């Protein structure tokens, strides 16, 4: 029995169109990279059908004539063994000709082109990576050599139906048809290898299993034709067992639970169901790292189902890329990527918010200004931070491992919250983890650092650098190593920015040991202080000559109390930008305020003592002064303005 829906083509002249370049590129990736996970076309096409019904429901809140006397929304899947086709039909919003060309012939999703362009050759072979992106309608070409779409937009006349057909190789055709029912039917003409055998998709029981696996949570009924067992008739008195077969009926039966997963109580939902739902809404082939599902009561009532992914998406640091949660109001789908429901530093969180209090006609502009939305956003932030804290502070090894995984993927993004979410700054600070100068290979929290502070230590000391090796070998660290004082080593680009906002932790000040004067307080004895004051006097002539030689390269020159082995280091004032920060801002094309470092010199180093030598000519003194400054700049992670001049000076001094 054929399960196709007949339509009448009344325009034999086909309009041929060429796919947008990005679509052709995506189609190539889909057919060549996702063949090992061909099942996903069921998930993708059912999801699209569900979205179409959600959009109709939303539009009909203002104009219920769009239902056309058929308000029972549904998705139907029909298998035709003779024609070797599978058809996915919905009675949702449908498309007109312009919609079909735009939605099926171009990629409108923001950032898609950039995503495709950034993929390396090896990444283009990574089916998992492509699958995370979400291939939607085009996934049908994994199993089909031709796809035809018959559609009519809700509210349009029957004669304004559209047929769209493509073999996925570079072009598609569009023609006008008559279609009595609104919505869309997508028919996949299966490739030979997918129409028979164990890889085939003409087995109705297999399609049912895939729907149960990927789409059981869809709140609409997903229906297939009912099959019944029909026995052969035997003559009366004949003891021969009756043979029989499964027979397809005209009755449609619902094959999914047809209830929104988030509307059920958490205790009634299995972990596998949560995982399947996550994969369906995110296109991520990995299970989520963890999740939280709650019904929030109060001035604003809403349900939150929030997931933390296992891996960071490729566009995580593209802040203009759309991020956010799916928003429903009273189970009516409103929008994807509702970024107003999460602070920016939690943009990696996925999931669903279903509110009972927001208006159905809510727009992004209304979301921006709504007090209720702010309440939901704040509640979501607290919930995620509480979830992360439960992992971070757990004694359970599995939970500790989960937090370590989370921090490796999303730690830098969380740090943005230190400056963006002052209300939760303390919660966020408790989640931060860093390497230190004394804890080899282990990450430390501020709380753990405080517990190990020396008697008399008044501050949490930290140092920022481009990488861990640079931090461990920094000249600024030498005095602290000598005295056995632990220093937190911050090696992310966002760290210095974040520390501008986080000036203390649990009432203990944080001090960057590369900025301003180093005051060890009770950790420095009186003899050391007296020796430092004496060095300031004896070195004054050399310091003055260095100031003159360096000119406007240095803000000042001082005798250092922080150096042990190195001849010199650069120090910036409190509140000023480090060389690394200046370099990063310049690379981002931002205007950077003029900032000059102070050169600190080690009076006990042979190279500095050489500057005191009366045998040193004025020319050689100037050269050595420049070399010492440049070496300090390099040790601090900065870049030389004129590397050739530096090398020339070094070579000239070596030949003396």
Curated annotation (Swiss-Prot):
It is found in: Cytoplasm. GO terms for molecular function: ATP binding; ATP hydrolysis activity; ATP-dependent protein folding chaperone; unfolded protein binding. Residues 365-583 are annotated as: B. It comes from the Bacteria. Belongs to the heat shock protein 90 family. Homodimer. NCBIfam families: PRK05218.1. This is Chaperone protein HtpG. It comes from Psychrobacter arcticus (strain DSM 17307 / VKM B-2377 / 273-4). The gene is htpG.
């Amino acid at each position: 029995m054929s399960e196709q829906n007949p339509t009448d083509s009344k325009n034999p002249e086909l309009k041929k169109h060429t796919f947008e370049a990005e679509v052709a590129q995506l189609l190539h990736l889909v057919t060549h990279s996702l063949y090992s996970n061909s099942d996903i076309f069921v998930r993708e096409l059912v999801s699209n059908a569900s979205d179409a019904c959600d959009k109709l429901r939303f539009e009909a809140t203002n104009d219920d004539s769009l239902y056309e006397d058929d308000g029972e929304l549904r998705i139907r899947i029909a298998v035709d063994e003779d024609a070797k086709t599978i058809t996915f039909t919905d009675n949702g919003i449908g498309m007109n000709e312009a919609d079909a060309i735009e939605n099926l012939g171009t990629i409108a999703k923001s950032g898609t082109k950039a995503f495709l362009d950034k993929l390396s050759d090896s990444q283009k072979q990574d089916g998992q990576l492509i699958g995370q992106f979400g291939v939607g309608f085009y996934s049908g070409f994994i199993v089909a050599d031709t796809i035809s779409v018959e559609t009519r937009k809700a509210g349009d006349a029957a004669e304004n139906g559209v047929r769209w057909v493509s073999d996925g190789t570079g072009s598609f055709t569009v023609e006008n048809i008559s279609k009595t029912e609104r919505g869309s039917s997508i028919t996949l003409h299966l490739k030979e290898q997918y129409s028979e055998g164990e890889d085939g998709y003409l087995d109705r029981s297999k399609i049912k299993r895939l729907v149960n696996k990927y789409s059981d949570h869809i709140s609409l009924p997903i229906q297939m034709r009912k099959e019944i067992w029909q026995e052969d008739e035997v003559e009366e008195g004949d003891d021969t067992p009756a043979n029989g077969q499964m027979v397809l009926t005209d009755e449609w039966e619902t094959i999914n639970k047809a209830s929104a997963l988030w509307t059920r109580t958490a205790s009634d939902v299995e972990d596998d169901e949560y995982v399947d739902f996550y994969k369906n809404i995110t296109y991520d082939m990995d299970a989520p790292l963890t999740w939280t599902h709650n019904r929030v009561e109060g001035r604003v009532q809403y349900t939150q189902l929030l997931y933390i992914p296992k891996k960071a998406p490729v566009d995580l640091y593209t802040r203009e890329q759309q991020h956010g949660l799916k928003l429903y109001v009273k189970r009516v789908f409103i929008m994807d990527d509702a970024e107003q429901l999460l602070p920016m530093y939690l943009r990696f969180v996925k999931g669903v918010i279903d509110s009972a209090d927001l208006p159905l006609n809510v727009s992004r502009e209304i979301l921006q200004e709504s007090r209720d939305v702010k309440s939901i956003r704040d509640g979501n932030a607290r919930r995620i931070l509480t979830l992360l804290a439960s992992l971070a502070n757990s004694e359970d090894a599995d939970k500790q491992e989960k937090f370590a995984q989370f921090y490796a993927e999303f730690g830098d993004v969380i740090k943005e919250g230190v400056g963006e979410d002052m209300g939760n700054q303390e919660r966020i600070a408790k989640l931060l983890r860093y390497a230190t100068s004394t804890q080899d290979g282990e990450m430390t929290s501020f709380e753990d650092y405080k517990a190990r502070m020396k008697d008399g230590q008044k501050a949490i000391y930290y140092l920022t650098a481009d990488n861990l090796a640079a931090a461990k070998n920094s000249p600024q660290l030498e005095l602290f190593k000598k005295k056995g004082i632990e220093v937190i080593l911050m090696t992310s680009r966002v760290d210095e920015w974040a520390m501008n906002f986080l000036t203390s932790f649990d009432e203990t000040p944080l001090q960057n040991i590369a900025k301003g004067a180093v005051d060890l307080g009770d950790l420095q004895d009186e003899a050391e202080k007296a020796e430092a004051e004496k060095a300031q006097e004896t070195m004054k002539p050399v310091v003055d000559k260095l100031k003159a030689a360096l000119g406007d390269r240095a803000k000042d020159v001082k005798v250092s109390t922080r150096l042990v082995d190195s001849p010199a280091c650069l120090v910036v004032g409190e509140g000023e930008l480090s060389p690394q920060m200046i370099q990063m801002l310049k690379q981002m094309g931002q205007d950077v305020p003029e900032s000059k470092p102070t050169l600190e010199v080690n009076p006990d180093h042979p190279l500095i003592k050489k500057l005191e030598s009366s045998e040193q000519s004025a020319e050689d003194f100037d050269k050595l002064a420049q070399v010492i400054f440049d070496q300090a700049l390099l040790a601090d992670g900065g870049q030389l303005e004129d590397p050739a001049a530096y090398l020339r000076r070094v070579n000239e001094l070596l030949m003396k």
